[in-house]
Curated annotation (Swiss-Prot):
Residues 199-202 are annotated as: Aspartate. This is Aspartate--tRNA(Asp/Asn) ligase. GO terms for cellular component: cytoplasm. Homodimer. The gene is aspS. It is found in: Cytoplasm. L-aspartate binds at E175, R221, H450, R490. Keywords: Aminoacyl-tRNA synthetase, ATP-binding, Cytoplasm, Ligase, Nucleotide-binding, Protein biosynthesis. Coiled coil: none annotated. Its main location: cytoplasm.
Length: 592
């Protein structure tokens, strides 16, 4: 062993012991003939003092610079009174260095690693990720990630789950996003697909009698990136047999409660369970942030006969929605703020943002301030009564197709909640349940809200007769407005699976071509089963307070799915393409 202790693990318990440390020079200071080195390793920092009484060590220390890799042997002693550092685990002690060996020198890093206040571009950090990881902030996040996965494994092991690996090279199946395709050299002209999830394989494991499965799985989706999306991501994938949806939610809730309690010291009460219809009605989102105490109120029925077309049109449209958002005590918002909110909802397709300021409600219309009151005067007081408006409030309105209203007003609710500091608590977990089985596309076809293997609450006959009315036995875990996990019970009979494919417009021939292995499995006695998948990266992001999942992944991709460190993706040699039977088509040149 080259070392006896980690730098960050030294405490007063080691006083008067001789220790050997290995690590990097975090910071070097020369004070009046005494050299101080802050030594850093994975566990933290410790101060090393080298004085002229050890001439050889002092001469070596005089030449070292930041990020040199050193091996230091010395004696642990208590710091002099007044020089302690309460911000460090090792802040009560220091190491009096006796021997120093330079294991590796370092050039000056492209950005400082010992100053968290330096503003470094993300692309620069990713290009030199091997250096960025040395920063204590990044090391802490990766260490925390390891603790999370270790606790999850232990929890699932204790509850009888088996860790089973599923294939990375598989075939393309319709799961919503584009697949990453891998050409086969042996089967020329054919392609593997990297898995978007282990969904079908974990269902087959249940048919195989595994009973309880889990895997911390790599998944791949070729989709547009956002702050919480990556082309490759990690999923805590879980499947069980002979449990109902309540059992699965209780099991996964228990795991989440344990994570937050043991790693953050946060104790959760029983998670609320909210139907999808309630979430959309009150919060215009299927992942509501319950820390914000604002709710939407439907008012379309009051607008049926108004002459104001902005409201009358959506009120009479079966696919329209008019929703009011009352913000208590915000009637003093300046016009500039309202204009900014109007621009904000425009991002989501809203054509404007109507509002009413309630100054003195007892004066009726005269006590209101709004450019729209004159158009809805006959029903305005009834409207304000429905939303519970009081003096000093402002009420915003969204009127359009339901999707536009939900997207715009749901986002506005969250933005206003944060802008006006209305957040009532630090954490608000819940389950959203009773999702629709299908949603209608613009061309009148049905598509799965989750995936085509989700079990409906309806019978086969009802699914065929009224697919739009079918609810699924699906459940999403939502934390602070972010979906951290989602799952469902699965279809386990051939008859129901064929009925769902039929509703989705998947012919028998297409089903056999793409899913013959699943349909075959359902012919041989599949158990009732269901599961869930957590987005590990997203969960770690929330628990650490990181602003992006890129900050909790060792080697992430950029928003354009590139790796600045390795320059991936990159062109390949012509002979490699020839072996795969691939010829690249020349792309038209972009005009200047």
């Amino acid at each position: 062993m080259m070392r006896t202790h980690y730098c960050g693990s030294l405490t007063e318990a080691q006083i008067d012991q001789t220790v050997t440390l290995c690590g990097w020079v975090h910071r070097r200071r020369d004070h009046g003939g005494v050299i101080f080195l802050d030594m850093r390793d994975r566990d933290g920092l410790v101060q090393v003092v080298i004085d002229p009484d050890t001439p050889e060590a002092f001469a070596t220390a005089d030449k070292v610079r930041s990020e040199f890799v050193l091996k230091i042997t010395g004696r642990v002693r208590r710091r002099y009174e007044g020089t302690e550092n309460s911000n460090m685990v090792s802040g009560q002690i220091e190491v009096l260095g006796k021997e120093i060996e330079v294991l590796a020198q370092s050039e000056t890093p492209p950005f400082p690693l010992n100053d968290d206040n330096i503003n470094i571009s993300e692309e620069h950090r990713l290009k030199y990720r091997f250096l960025d990881i040395r920063r204590p902030e990044m090391l802490d996040r990766l260490r925390f990630r390891s603790k999370v996965t270790n606790l999850i494994r232990n929890y699932l092991d204790d509850h009888g789950f088996l860790d089973v690996e599923t294939p990375i090279l598989t075939r393309a199946t319709p799961e919503g996003a584009r697949d990453y395709l891998v050409p086969s050299r042996v089967q020329n002209g054919s392609f593997y697909a990297l898995p978007q999830s282990p969904q079908l394989f974990k269902q087959l494991l249940m048919v195989g009698g595994i009973d309880r499965y889990y895997q911390i799985a790599k998944c791949f989706r070729d989709e547009d990136l956002r702050a919480d999306r990556q082309p490759e991501f990690t999923q805590i994938d879980i499947e069980t047999s002979f449990l109902n949806d309540d059992d699965i939610m209780d099991l996964m809730e228990g795991m989440t409660v344990k994570l937050f309690d043991e790693l953050l010291g946060i104790k959760f009460d029983k998670f609320q369970r909210m139907p999808y219809s309630e979430a959309m009605r009150d919060y215009a989102s299927d992942k509501p942030d319950l820390r914000i105490p604002l709710k939407l109120v439907d008012v379309a029925d009051l607008m049926q006969d108004v002459e104001f077309k902005v409201f009358a049109g959506p009120a009479k449209d079966p696919k329209g929605r008019i929703a009011a958002l009352r913000v208590p005590g915000a009637g003093a918002l300046p016009r500039s703020a309202i204009d900014e909110y109007t621009k904000f909802v425009g991002i989501y397709g809203a054509k404007g943002l109507a509002y009413i300021k309630v100054n003195e409600i007892e004066k009726g219309v005269e006590g209101l301030q709004s450019p729209i009151v004159k158009f809805i005067e006959p029903i305005v007081m009834q409207l304000l009564e429905r939303v519970g408006a009081e003096n000093g409030d402002i009420v915003f309105f969204g009127a359009d197709k339901a999707k536009v209203v939900n997207d715009a007003m749901g986002a506005l609710r969250v933005k206003i909640g944060h802008d006006l500091k209305l957040v009532t608590c630090e954490w608000a977990p819940l389950w959203v349940v009773d999702f629709p089985m299908f949603e209608e596309t613009d061309d009148g076809k049905w598509t799965s809200v989750h995936h085509p293997f989700t079990l409906p609450k309806s019978s086969v006959e009802d699914v065929k007769a009224n697919p739009g009315e079918a609810l699924s036995v699906a459940y999403d875990m939502v934390l602070n407005g972010t979906e951290v996990g989602g799952g469902s019970l699965r279809i386990y009979t051939l008859e129901m699976q064929k009925a769902i494919f039929e509703a989705l417009g998947i012919s028998d021939e297409e089903a056999e071509e793409k899913f013959s292995f699943l349909l075959n499995a359902l012919r041989y006695g599949a158990p009732p089963h269901g599961g869930l998948a957590f987005g590990l990266d997203r969960l770690i992001m929330l628990m650490t307070g990181a602003s992006s999942i890129r900050d909790v992944i060792a080697f992430p991709k950029t928003k354009t799915a590139e790796c600045p460190l390795t320059q991936a993706p990159a062109p390949v040699e012509a002979n490699q393409l020839r072996d795969l039977g691939i010829r690249l088509r020349e792309q038209p040149k972009k005009e200047d």
